[in-house]
Amino acid sequence: MDKYIFKKDSALTADLCKLCIEYFESSDRKEDDKSRGYKGIAASLEFDTFTDLLMILNLNMQSYVDQHSYLTRLYAPWRVDNVFNIQKYEPGYAYVEEHMEHGKDRRDSTRLLGWMAYLNTINNKGGTIWPQQNFNSSPKEGDLYIWPAGWTHSHYGIAAPEETKYILTGWCSFVGVDNT
């Protein structure tokens, strides 16, 4: 772990990554959203479709908590949100605006952690940069990242100039809000 950014190599199997991409491509729930620097297509899903993914995330969240025991002593319980996104970025596109996962609306304001998994390997650029930590990720199929949702871990994507990038992304939030 580097600067509270947890990385688990190959957390997702190649088969699970392929299944997620195939599900995304066949989904009628895709939305093309170009607001706030986001240039890609997303589909919001629930874990009842991907129970293996929820088990993998919970296992890795426990590893994150084991390294940061304060997370067990917070004033309210929290867990992996039931909803997550599959996102597709065509060559030359990325979420280029620096942003954080914690936000101002009711749902976003309860976020404690963000997570992201790469569904395919990108050979030229295509990663994510956390500028305040001077940390760059390299997109490798199955790799999972977990980080704090607040302003200290703002981040942005780098476009892959020649390859299509697929990611999963979601959050851990305090329990008792509509998205948990």
What do the predicted segments below correspond to?
Residues 1-144, 152-180:
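Fe(II)/2-oxoglutarate oxygenase catalytic core
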